[in-house]
Amino acid sequence: MDPCDCAKTGTCNCGATCKCTNCQCKTCKKSCCPCCPSGCSKCASGCVCKGNSCGSSCCQ
């Protein structure tokens, strides 16, 4: 897992497929954030966030 400054800056951007805004994650994988963008109530682990949103299969 790659460290990110999400907890400090509110922005997690790891790799081309991962960008979460206003999330609380402290670590993230290159292809996956363990957090959801605002408006997403819950993300399943292993989901892939694209842009500022999660796919419908990722959000619960």
UniProtKB/Swiss-Prot annotation:
Q: Locate the region Beta.
A: 1-28
Binding positions (a divalent metal cation 5): C33, C35, C36, C49
Pfam families in alphabetical order:
Metallothio (PF00131)
Instruction: Tell whether Metal-binding is among the UniProt keywords.
Output: yes
Q: Which residues bind a divalent metal cation 3?
A: C14, C18, C23, C28
- Give a yes or no for keyword Protein biosynthesis in this entry: no
What's the superkingdom here?
Answer: Eukaryota
Binding residues for a divalent metal cation 6? C36, C40, C43, C59
User: Which Gene Ontology molecular function entries are recorded, alphabetically?
Assistant: metal ion binding
The residues that hold a divalent metal cation 1 are C4, C6, C20, C23
- Residues bound to a divalent metal cation 4 are C32, C33, C43, C47
Q: Where does a divalent metal cation 2 bind?
A: C6, C12, C14, C25
- What are the boundaries of the region Alpha? 29-60
Protein residues bound to a divalent metal cation 7: C49, C54, C58, C59
Write out the entry's keywords from A to Z. Answer: Metal-binding, Metal-thiolate cluster
What does the comment on domains in this protein's record state? Class I metallothioneins contain 2 metal-binding domains: four divalent ions are chelated within cluster A of the alpha domain and are coordinated via cysteinyl thiolate bridges to 11 cysteine ligands. Cluster B, the corresponding region within the beta domain, can ligate three divalent ions to 9 cysteines.
User: What is the similarity comment for this entry?
Assistant: Belongs to the metallothionein superfamily. Type 1 family.
Role according to the record: Metallothioneins have a high content of cysteine residues that bind various heavy metals.
Q: What is this protein called?
A: Metallothionein-1
State the species of origin.
Cyprinus carpio (Common carp)
